[in-house]
Swiss-Prot record:
PANTHER family (UniProt xref): LARGE RIBOSOMAL SUBUNIT PROTEIN UL23M, RIBOSOMAL PROTEIN L23-RELATED
GO terms, molecular function: structural constituent of ribosome
Subcellular location: Mitochondrion
Range of the transit peptide: 1-34
Subunit structure and binding partners: Component of the mitochondrial large ribosomal subunit (mt-LSU). Mature yeast 74S mitochondrial ribosomes consist of a small (37S) and a large (54S) subunit. The 37S small subunit contains a 15S ribosomal RNA (15S mt-rRNA) and at least 32 different proteins. The 54S large subunit contains a 21S rRNA (21S mt-rRNA) and at least 45 different proteins. uL23m forms the wall of the exit tunnel. Interacts with the C-terminus of OXA1.
Pfam families in UniProt: Ribosomal_L23 (PF00276)
Function text: Component of the mitochondrial ribosome (mitoribosome), a dedicated translation machinery responsible for the synthesis of mitochondrial genome-encoded proteins, including at least some of the essential transmembrane subunits of the mitochondrial respiratory chain. The mitoribosomes are attached to the mitochondrial inner membrane and translation products are cotranslationally integrated into the membrane.
Protein name stated in the entry: Large ribosomal subunit protein uL23m
UniProt family annotation: Belongs to the universal ribosomal protein uL23 family.
Gene: mrp20
Length: 161
């Protein structure tokens, strides 16, 4: 039977752990961005039970957002973020990012459902939905309710824009 040191019993985790890449750390260390309410024990239990990683130590730090003035001149601060540095028993090496995307033609979907155009880290323009293609696919289905909902959506889109 395993011991649980954290406060919460996590059966199906609803906590998002974001692995931060690009920091100059030794291979036994990894940095995660976690919600503010997560503590060190929760991090250790999560990594141990979900990913079966043996954690040696956990160090956490809260980074405050920089102050700025909005358009009304009010001083605001964005939400703080918590980063956790985890030391593991076994070294961890990041997988290499793919350099060549020739296997996928532009416009085709990748196995995860994303588009080749949206693979850049910070996309400048969001991809526009091709309504003609959507309407053609819906018209292939001869369901009366779908056709009615398609017409309602088209009317709503015309009203807004």
């Amino acid at each position: 039977m395993s011991k649980i040191a954290g406060k919460r019993l996590v059966y199906f985790p609803n906590i998002t752990f974001t692995l931060c890449r690009g920091l100059n750390l030794q291979p036994k260390f990894a940095v995660f961005r976690v919600p503010l309410h997560v503590n060190k024990f929760d991090v250790r239990d999560y990594l141990q039970h979900v990913y079966n990683l043996k954690v040696v130590s956990v160090k956490s730090r809260i980074y405050q957002g920089k102050l700025f003035r909005n358009q009304l001149g009010q001083v605001k601060r964005p939400q703080s973020e918590k980063r956790v540095i985890v030391e593991m028993e076994e070294p961890f090496v990041y997988p290499n990012a793919p350099n060549d995307l020739k296997d996928w033609q532009e416009g085709e979907l990748l196995p995860d459902g994303s588009n080749v155009k949206t693979l850049s880290r910070y996309p400048k323009v969001l991809e526009q939905v091709d309504m003609k293609r959507v309407n053609e696919e819906l018209s292939k289905l001869q369901d009366k309710q779908i056709l009615e909902s398609q017409q309602k959506i088209a009317r709503l889109l015309k009203k807004k824009y």
